[in-house]
Amino acid sequence: MEWTDEGIVLGVRRHGESSAIVELLTRAHGRHLGLVRGGAGSRMRPLLQPGNSVSAVWRARLDEHLGTYAVEGLKLRAATLLASSHGVYGVTHLASIARLLPERDPHEEIFGLLEHSLDDFDDIGSAAVHVIHFELAMLAELGFGLALDNCAVTGETTDLIYVSPKSGGAVSRGAGEPWRDRLLRLPPFLRHGETATELTDQDLQDGFRLTGLFLLRHVLEPRGQVHSDARAGFINALTRQQARAAIPAP
């Protein structure tokens, strides 16, 4: 058995004295593990960092075997990602939720979204938007997508500013007003057909609250899991950055 594919490094663990078991999210073969001989050595370590894109050749005698990887670097983002706290927490969190995908099951849209997200991670505000969109996409990919295109009560497609915490459906301003205190806020950058001209700190916090609730309820808790420490670390880094930006210059 042999195939060649692009992959994004999700994680690495040492195996024996010098090898490593590498977990990739590949474009055509899904989340896939393999042994890299010499992967724990100084030459390969910088290549096998979470967030890096590699070209991987996987070989095994039988399809169900772990197999071995021969990898070459395509885009080495890790040094940049790991230079900031939001980058460290962000790539760790994205890898942890990508790991929720079943092994060896192709998810090309998720691969493309992860690749695009990691390529635009320098600014913490942009990174936060990418993380929220990735969490939404993962909910949909795992069968728990939110219905944000029209109002769950009236069917309207405009003025959608709330989300029902029960159904995961959008709710229009008029329909939701009597229950506004019980509803989640739908930030402008997630509203169907709208282009957010400004991104506020509250928008980002509302986005994380929205995706966090449904990820926990539908995906994590049934598996006996909770949100990763990396997710909390990313949100804390975002909050600190927002607080610094709000302090007026002397």
Curated annotation (Swiss-Prot):
The superkingdom of the source organism is: Bacteria
Which cellular components does GO assign to this protein?
Answer: bacterial nucleoid
Q: Which GO terms describe its biological process?
A: DNA recombination; double-strand break repair
Which key words are in the record? DNA damage, DNA recombination, DNA repair
Q: What does this protein do?
A: Involved in DNA repair and RecF pathway recombination.
Family per record: Belongs to the RecO family.
Please identify the protein, giving its name as recorded. DNA repair protein RecO
**Native source organism of the sequence:** Bradyrhizobium diazoefficiens (strain JCM 10833 / BCRC 13528 / IAM 13628 / NBRC 14792 / USDA 110)
The gene for this chain is: recO
